[in-house]
Amino acid sequence: MEKNRSAFQQNQQASNQPFNQDQNQYYQDPNQQQFNQSGFDPNQQQFNQPGFDPNQQYYQDPNQQQFNQAGFDQNQQYYQDPNQQQFNQPGFDPNQQYYQDPNQQQFNQAGFDQNQYYQDPNQQQFNQSGFDQNQYYQDPNQQQFNQPSFDLNNQQFNQPGFNQSPAFEITPQEQKAEQEMFGEEPPQVVREIHELPFEKIRSFLQSDFDSYNFRLNSLKSKLDNALYSLDKTIQNTNENTANLEAIRHNLEQKIQNQSKQLRTNFDTQKLDDKINELEIRMQKLTRNFESLSELSKHNSYPNYYEKLLPNGGDSMTNVFEKALMMNLLRTTLPPQPQVQYYPQPYPYIRPYYDEPIYAGFRRRGYRDDFYE
């Protein structure tokens, strides 16, 4: 209790002290600016006094900006509202909302451009002689100074607004013309005639020729087999015509016998139907036999097809017959071995070893033999 009472008495004594001497009471906020009294914080923002840091940004916080001017009301909380900021100066309108826009911050000074001052925080222009207002802080990455031979991006010259003007932009056409006029010619390799890789060219052409030759020979052998089998089938049809004649004679005999037997029956309606059916079959058989006999007359290949076809050309039936012949060939003939016109050894296949792949002096994805 004694401790608490003594602390309370100390607080009462501190509160009874004059206001301007109680350092801890006046600015409880350590971010606010203390004036020229003992215990002044040198890290805070000092104005035109000895020890002023000109490199420090002048307006770190718009809520601080305190002046030691006569008539300053120290008891008033200086920045209760950033839109008020009242000074007791002649001509100051305390009813005017002082900070309508924090980017404007207007002072009644001569020559001060009120619309200009804080339009863009990256511009921050001062009325100094030789200061380029359009140049300063347009781009925080450029930050150009009026110094001779100052070159950040390899494109600044000591002319105001040089890079911003479109007159100095180089079009692609100008760039191309400039390259043609002043650029170096590309190096041209002129090889002597004996330096050309004749052997490599010949080997490439030879490999192509070998592959085409092999394919043409295999095609020729297939065509020879097809022609041979067609001749065979024509001979077989000629041999089969005699057998077909005998078969036709036997069929006629059988049909006559059957018709005699059927005529003896009593069911006349069924008899008529049977006779009609047999006559139709007979007509079909005679037509087939006529076509076969016609085929046997013209047995000279390759003209016997054209005499049978209507207008001497190719037709779908002809193509279908050819396809049937080739299918017959494929099913009946054994596969013929290809004729070797020159010896063709097996290609040498490099054996594959599971070697470790080393990372040093080697690109990924290539094997060791690429570098040997």
Swiss-Prot record:
Residues 38-49 have a biased composition (Polar residues). This is Proline-rich P65 protein homolog. Sequence repeats lie at residues 29-40, 41-52, 53-60, 61-72, 73-80, 81-92, 93-100, 101-112, 113-119, 120-131, 132-138, 139-150, 151-162. The keyword Lyase does not apply. It comes from Mycoplasma genitalium (strain ATCC 33530 / DSM 19775 / NCTC 10195 / G37) (Mycoplasmoides genitalium). Residues 1-37, 53-100 have a biased composition (Low complexity). Residues 1-100, 122-150 are annotated as: Disordered. The lineage of its organism: Bacteria, Bacillati, Mycoplasmatota, Mycoplasmoidales, Mycoplasmoidaceae. Keywords: Repeat. It comes from the Bacteria.
